[in-house]
Every structure is written in structure tokens, then in C-alpha cells.
Curated annotation (Swiss-Prot):
InterPro entries named among the record's database cross-references: Taw3, tRNA_yW-synthesising, tRNA_yW-synthesising-like_sf
Tagged with keyword Cell inner membrane: no
HAMAP family from the UniProt entry: TYW3_archaea (MF_00266)
Species of provenance: Aeropyrum pernix (strain ATCC 700893 / DSM 11879 / JCM 9820 / NBRC 100138 / K1)
Keyword tRNA processing applies: yes
Xref: Pfam families: TYW3
Protein's name in the database: tRNA(Phe) 7-((3-amino-3-carboxypropyl)-4-demethylwyosine(37)-N(4))-methyltransferase
EC main group: transferase
GO biological process: tRNA methylation; wybutosine biosynthetic process
Role this protein plays: S-adenosyl-L-methionine-dependent methyltransferase that acts as a component of the wyosine derivatives biosynthesis pathway.
Molecular functions per Gene Ontology: tRNA methyltransferase activity
EC number in record: 2.1.1.282
Amino acid sequence: MGSIEEVLLEERLIGYLDPGAEKVLARINRPSKIVSTSSCTGRITLIEGEAHWLRNGARVAYKTHHPISRSEVERVLRRGFTNLWLKVTGPILHLRVEGWQCAKSLLEAARRNGFKHSGVISIAEDSRLVIEIMSSQSMSVPLVMEGARIVGDDALDMLIEKANTILVESRIGLDTFSREVEELVECF
């Protein structure tokens, strides 16, 4: 296996990495006691279904890892969905970590940078932990319910602006977090 930069480049080229994730993940993977196992840098989705949180009752109609435009949303709205949700989620990372001190410092850095929903999700017998770093920034709002568009043009513009702001601000937090991780001496 090559350097972390080579691995990340290969994963991006085959579609495993979100756009812009390489620099952040290279920083996070620099300390020897931390290895990223999965990542999402945040995204905006338009979800068809009565309840966007149901696995079997919803499907992604549109997804982007970039700020969304009014024309992109309108193009999906014209497809005539019975129920459609606008959802934005911030970044989420899963990191395999060696040792409690490194994990504690990692979680403290995460919380300082807006990742309030972070914690230990598993502990292996060899004392390795899996940490989930999860942004608290999100938004979910219905645009269409029972075939009726419930959001007017002005409100739609405000929602799109808010979704884009959430996405951008959560990425700034991810960048700042990744820079702090590079400095965690207890993780080397």
C-alpha cells in the first residue's frame, strides 16, 4: 500500500471519496493512532417519500456534495413527486483509534469544532475504538406533501440559501477539526 495521499487519490478517482475530502482525510490520518474507515463531507439531498428517515419508504431523487441551485431543485420538483424533502447533513467520519487518551482528545477537538453528536461507537478487545465524528448541523424540510407543493418561491429561495450555508459552515468546521487533529501529540 502507498502513502495516505496515494490511497486517498485512488479512492477519489474510483468514486469512494467525496469531492474535497482528500486534504481533510490526509490531515486526520497523519497521526499514527488514527485511521479513517469511512467519511462524508456533508451533502444536500432531495428525498422522495412520506418520511425521509425510513429506509424502505424513501429514495434519493437528487444528491450533491456542493451548494445547490434553484434550477437544480426546480428540475427535481418538475418530476412530480407525491412527497419530496430537502435535507442537508453535515460531515460524518468513522475513525479507528488506538488508546483512550487519543480518543478523548479527538472527541474534545470534535466538540470544539461543532461536532457535538460525536462519540465512541465500538471498542475492540485490543483497545482500539471506533469513533464517530458527526456534525450537529442539519436541516430537513418537506417541499411537497401529498402531491401539493407546500413551499412558495420566496420560501424555497430562503431554504436553498440556508441549506447551502449549513453545508459550507459545516465544512469549515471539518477543516478546522482536521487541522487540530494534526496537532494531537497523544495520537502519534
